[in-house]
Amino acid sequence: MKTFLISTLSLWAIAMQAQETQSISTGQGYNQQCYVNLAEGTGQQKANTSWDIAFSVAPEDAGIFINESVGSAQGALPIQAYFTVSDDFNAVPEPAFFEGYPLYNRETSWAYGALNEYHEPGNPNDFGWGVYDPGTQEINGIYVYAIQLRDGSYLKLQVQSLINGVYTFRYANFDGSGEVTKTISKSDHAGKMLAYFSFQTGTTVDIEPANGFDLIFCRYYDLLHQGGDSVQYLVTGILSADGVEVAEARQVNPDSVKYQDYVDSLSTIPDIIGQDRKVLT
């Protein structure tokens, strides 16, 4: 059983300089994610295998994420997405080619996930998986992605559109068999950060606590620098929810540190706490 201890001033907005300690569990061998509500002192665990991909439901966003969280058991696999560099859903993806184009969530924004990679920098109409048409106010999908599931098998996936707040996407086995088309409406997930989907069940999954959350304790891939190289490495860390502001105060006394000293450092980037600010017991 892996347990994290947080001793933090994250409740400043509720009770200035009130310090509390909360114990958070991510299950045996990191096999769970934990969604924490700091104000209520609660944590809700969900199995890593509960969901596979997730869609942003914020009005102006079109982010699509993969579930990188995986337990530490030998041979356990996360969900992995690959860019096939093809727009032909009928074509059979070739692993020898697409395995050179793995995609990862960047943990720098809840507006852009793994399937938003390869968008044109500086072009606000390019969302990677599709392009926004100002005339029709629709995002039309382009590319096909290869998705490796936790059992090692593959699906091909194409997000076809985002129209009037409704995502339409299709997926199938590489040979085209078992093709399924699904829709996810943002309005069905009002008040949530993401709409979560499981390929195993073919349905959306209720993941986030009903009372909201501030932090997620999970495993994810982070770009780490080793010597002169940069490597995507599976880490255990803490991500802040969309809109939650975080400031890092290093080498301070928790009993005397002042909120006012860090107001200008507050940021909504999800990985401010990240993978290097934890204590394991």
Where on the chain are the PLM-derived regions?
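Bacterial Sec-dependent N-terminal signal peptides
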Residues: 1-22
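Surface-exposed, beta-sheet-biased, low-hydrophobicity segments with strongly acidic/polar composition
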Residues: 19-281
